[in-house]
Amino acid sequence: MGQIDSRAQQTAHAIWSAWTGGYRLTRLPKEIRPTNAADGWAAQLALAELAGPSYGYKFAATSKAGQAHIGVTRPLPGMLFADFRRDPGAVLPSAGLHMRVVEAEFAFLMGRDVPSGATAAEVVDAVDTLHLAIEVPDSRFEHFERAGEPALLADAACAGWFVLGPEVSDWRGLDLGAAETELWINGARAATGRGANVLGDPRAALASMADQLARFGTTLRADQVITTGTTTVPPPIAPSDHVQAKFGPLGSVSVSFAS
């Protein structure tokens, strides 16, 4: 391994140790701290070797609220790891959560590979199905809002738990930007938003994801799930909470948290 590969592996080991050990990093040691996006992505690839199979990507900070939440100025791609995927209605662990927020998102299941250099229309055309989703992001950094883009890329863009909900039928003719979203916690409405909050439209976020991955020499693949970011300001959650993400006439998806 070259020096950069070795440093990326050390970064990944530090992050994975915090992830599995249930503690937070104040800051990475200077000698293994990523200083640019390429370093951060290399560390995320090394993290994937520790975290196990991935099945797609999340797109963090596609809304102004999301960017403010984690202290960045542009969206960041992060791998979704299979060990942290759950079905609708699941009870997620509360212990060890640091961010303690929940997000209502639109997610796409890709039907075929997307070649490098594809247009936005070609990226959307490669989609198989659209789904409603809930993400419970998390970070291994104590002060994630000050960690910076390279470190957050290494941290899989604050990947955490993910729930892929029901398929939306006949979605291609819908104005997803106008689609209203709500998060209800224990029967009370906690947040509202709309699809336009993710780069104007979830389709635009998907196309932007393809462009972001291209920066790192990666493309979208068939059967990958791509979730496009929070449509609302993420509300806080607590142990024993029941969360329902409502997408108007498109449907809903729910999840609960252990006491």
Please provide the spans of the model-predicted regions.
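Catalytic-core "active-site belt" of small-molecule-metabolizing enzymes
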Residues: G2-D201, R215, A238, H242, ...
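Short, well-ordered amphipathic alpha-helical segments that serve as non-catalytic structural scaffolds
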Residues: A205-Q212
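DNA replication sliding-clamp ring fold and its partner-interaction surfaces
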Residues: Q212, F216-T219
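Structured functional modules or segments
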Residues: T218, I226-D241
